[in-house]
Design a protein with these regions (language model features):
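PAS-family sensory domains
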Residues: 2-9, 32, 70-71
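Core hydrophobic beta-sheet residues of small sensory/regulatory alpha/beta domains
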Residues: 14-18
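Conserved hydrophobic beta-strand signature of PAS-family and PAS-like sensory domains
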Residues: 23-24
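PAS/PAS-like sensory domain cap-loop motif
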Residues: 30-41
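PAS-family sensory/regulatory domains
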Residues: 40-56
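PAS/LOV-family and closely related PAS-like sensory domains
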Residues: 52-91, 100
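Short loop/turn elements at sensory-signaling interfaces that couple input to output
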Residues: 94-109, 114
Length: 115
């Protein structure tokens, strides 16, 4: 999957973030599942959809990738928890990719709820 493919995705929630971990795009399915509108969530940190107990691990992995450029979790299905706008946590399959765009890292993920 590429970032452009994630943007075109309509059946599964998709989110795109910049190299600072700020959300730059979500699709309509993301809005429906997570309860956030694009206007509300674009510009917010990815941690808004990550359980608080996973924030440290997220920051560590994100920083490590930005320093080394070596992925450990990208390009594979990951079973992780996500958080909706109302604070409800749910299990989901995350598939995360990264690409360099104009010399900057960008990230995209599809987040398929496991219900």
């Amino acid at each position: 999957m590429t970032i452009d493919e994630a943007i075109r995705e309509t059946e599964v929630p998709s989110v795109v973030a910049d190299g600072q971990g700020m959300i730059t795009y979500v699709n309509a399915r993301f809005e429906a599942v997570f309860g956030w509108s694009k206007d509300e969530i674009v510009g917010k940190s990815l941690t808004i959809i990550i359980p608080r107990t996973l924030h440290d691990a997220h920051h560590l992995g994100f920083s490590r990738f930005l320093v080394t450029g070596k992925p450990t979790l990208l390009g594979q299905a990951l079973s992780l928890r996500s958080v909706t706008r109302d604070g409800r946590e749910f299990d989901a399959e995350h598939f995360i990719v990264a690409e360099q765009r104009d010399g900057q890292w960008a990230f995209a993920a599809t987040i398929r709820p496991l219900r």
